[in-house]
Amino acid sequence: ALCAVDNTFATPYLQRPLEHGADIVSQSLTKYLGGHSDTIGGALIVDDEELDERLGFYQNSVGATPGPFDAFLVLRGTKTLPVRMDRHCENAMELAEWLQGHDAVDRVYYPGLESHPDHELAAEQMDDFGGMLSFELDGTLDEASTVVSETEVFTLAESLGGVESLIEQPAAMTHAAIPREERIAAGLTDGLIRVSVGIEHVDDMKTDLAAAFDAALS
């Protein structure tokens, strides 16, 4: 059996699964590696010549090759990857700590917080904790919908990994087709909100979310 790891959230800058025994690492080039929400692509990374040949044969057979301009955009994005990821991580940690202390929030999911069940594991294998977080609003499905609709710094969208901050509500967007009982059982509550923390000033993000919370819950 082969072990494959999706390293999109972490990027090679923060985590390198091949060093931890993975056979295949998948990376969405659309997200942090491109970094500017203007290209589409993906990559598989291996450290085995035979496996590389097998994957290369399949890639050529199905025509899964990027266009030249898409490749240029990804290569351009890699030049600023370290400085962008440092800012994503810094902002995400500060925002997670702020959310954790906010009365409108029940729970925050971010591996950089000591309250996260996998914090120690993440600290062992990652150089930092990334720019993705989610939190559970102390409110209903409609109130969570109001929050994601009222933000101005955060753009309502399902993607992630660009320089701009994005916000989305899984229960009403990415997982809307799943019956509520199944969704709740899987941990996707009505008030769950996912955030891709961008590189804007973190104080602007806090002000934006605070105003959205007030609009939804007051």
Sequence positions of predicted segments:
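Short, flexible turn/loop "capping" segments at secondary-structure junctions
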Residues: G35-H36, P66-P68, Q125-D128, A185-D190
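A common structural junction motif
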Residues: V62-G63, T151-S159, A212-S218
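Conserved small-domain helix->loop->beta segment predominantly found in fold-type I
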Residues: M93-E152, E158-G161, P179-I184
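Conserved PLP-enzyme active-site core in the AAT-like
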Residues: A1-A104, Y109
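Short, solvent-exposed beta-strand edge segments and adjacent coil->beta transition regions
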Residues: T39-G41, D128-M132, D190-R194
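Active-site beta-loop-alpha junctions enriched in small/polar residues
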Residues: T8-A10, L14, L113, D138, ...
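Short, well-ordered beta-strand elements within core beta-sheets of diverse protein domains
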Residues: L73-V83, G131-D138, R194-G198
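PLP-dependent enzyme catalytic core of the Aspartate aminotransferase-like
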Residues: S149, S165-S218
